């Protein structure tokens, strides 16, 4: 039995959902909304001591952190999206970490201040937006170069690194971040968004988020 805790708006949760879908694994969905404080309940903290989403229960194992969850899922299912070969696996790990540590952090700065801060009545930090965009102007060309030379982020084969980046880029339109200057990155993204593992979650991520926000506001 697999039980996933999270919220549909989170790109880190999306990472795990894409992985589960790609591996054709059935799971129970436990809506856990941090904005409502549901991640601080005693029940959830017993699953995830850090109080962060996503978290997962699988055959008695309680696990958190999206990258760790996906690595575990791919490993126990002997999937090539997380290679057995140590060298190939290291390359996948390197790109997974690059996306999670650098790209996600920079994009998150912009997304929070352009969308979630105004939505929740918090102060918008224009300097944080500037810094985030400045970093993305450094990071996107690196991704563009890699994807202009390879069909996938870690090389010739689709991997967890692609799932990571695909999920991280989901909020680009909401954050008013364009990747039009990066044709290889844009083509790669469009190709994966048409795949069943993605479509099972979202036909259109931006519209999904806007619908959720409008529903909450009673519009």
Question: Each predicted region: which residue ranges?
Answer:
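GST-like domain detector, emphasizing the conserved glutathione-binding G-site
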Residues: 1-130, 219
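Generic structural signal for helix capping and beta-alpha/helix-loop junctions
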Residues: 14, 37, 189, 209-210
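Conserved beta-strand edge residues that scaffold enzyme active sites
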Residues: 34-35, 161, 206
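Active-site-flanking alpha-helical
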Residues: 74, 168-169, 202
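GST-like fold's C-terminal all-alpha helical module
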Residues: 99-194
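Acidic/histidine-enriched, glycine/proline-rich intrinsically disordered or flexible terminal extensions
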Residues: 205-219
